[in-house]
Amino acid sequence: MGNFHTMLDALLEDQEEAVLATIVQVEGSAYRKAGASMLFKKKGRRIGLLSGGCVEEDVFQRISALGDQLTSTLIPYDMRSEDDLSWGMGAGCNGIIHVHAERITQEKRRHYEKVRDCLHSGKAVTSVIKIESSHYLFLTENGHFGNWPDAPLQDIQRTVSTLHLPHFDQTTNMFIQRIEPKPRLILFGAGPDNVPLANLAADTGFSVIVTDWRPAYCTSSLFPKADQLITAFPEQMLSEFQFFPHDAAVVATHHYQHDQTIINFLFSQNLHYIGLLGSANRTKRLLSGKHPPSHFYSPVGLKIGAEGPEEIAVSVVAEIIQTRKRVAVV
């Protein structure tokens, strides 16, 4: 779902006709997993990837050939052969991918606007699609909406609560996936050494929020990829800002008292990642004997021997992604 938010913005920025292609099932191994999507807009713009470049053109040709007749269709691609004439293009992906292509109707576009509103408010949405039909449903914590009045809600909710998502049920031809809010990185400190971190985080799919008390530092010219800039002292910012459980925060103000104030406050919040820039000795003094939560990381970043702002940015973003995916580094 890493590029879903970009596709959603591209879909809703105008009324241009579009087709959404989504991998609903992978048998064996493949370049992308189930849930990966690609948006094809009528004027030729494409957002996202379904593979390493093996199937995208064929998907485009198929949906172009169907034209206005396309509503919803399932396309299988056998990537197992290493023959250059096959879909594997010699890559030996060793898997079969099933791609669902659907034309986005005006009704569904309006429902996607509701989806975006939910995501922007920090709430996840579960998407349910009846393959090879025009039926779909979106589930939220407050209810559901869509064009499927007789949807088997109990069966769907049972699947959502018991199975790992995304999930494709071949018996019912339903594809269910959970759409998470765009992960946010709140970066405390707008020093020039934090610019590479903000840029890399934005490039890898994070909504970046930079906050600093110095107006000369907290500017769009220094942080062009930041979604939000907050110029305020830590006490004011922390009292007014709404944090979400999927947020990651990196504290790098280089100001001892400010860092201590921020860290003490963040420890009381339900965040998935808190990182502190600085040496182990400085961190020990900042904590003043407090026992940090398990999602606190300092020195911040994976231990890759990073030097300089650019390499440190790589290590920090990699560590945040690792915690989100819950993958151990061997």
Curated annotation (Swiss-Prot):
Record's keyword terms, sorted: NAD, Oxidoreductase, Purine metabolism
GO terms classed as biological process: hypoxanthine catabolic process
Transmembrane segments: none
Name the UniProt record assigns to this protein: Probable xanthine dehydrogenase subunit A
UniProt GO MF annotations: xanthine dehydrogenase activity
Enzyme Commission number(s) from the entry: 1.17.1.4
Pfam families per record: XdhC_C, XdhC_CoxI
Broadest EC class assigned to this enzyme: oxidoreductase
Species: Bacillus subtilis (strain 168)
Gene that produces this protein: pucA
Pathway: Purine metabolism; hypoxanthine degradation; urate from hypoxanthine: step 1/2; Purine metabolism; hypoxanthine degradation; urate from hypoxanthine: step 2/2
Chain's role: Oxidizes hypoxanthine and xanthine to uric acid. PucA subunit could exert a molybdenum cofactor recruiting function.
Quaternary context: Could be composed of four subunits: PucA, PucC, PucD and PucE.
Cytoplasm among keywords: no
Induction: Expression is very low in excess nitrogen (glutamate plus ammonia) and is induced during limiting-nitrogen conditions (glutamate). Expression decreases when allantoin is added during limiting-nitrogen conditions.
InterPro entries per the UniProt record, alphabetical: MoCofactor_Util/Proc, XdhC_CoxI, XdhC_Rossmann_dom
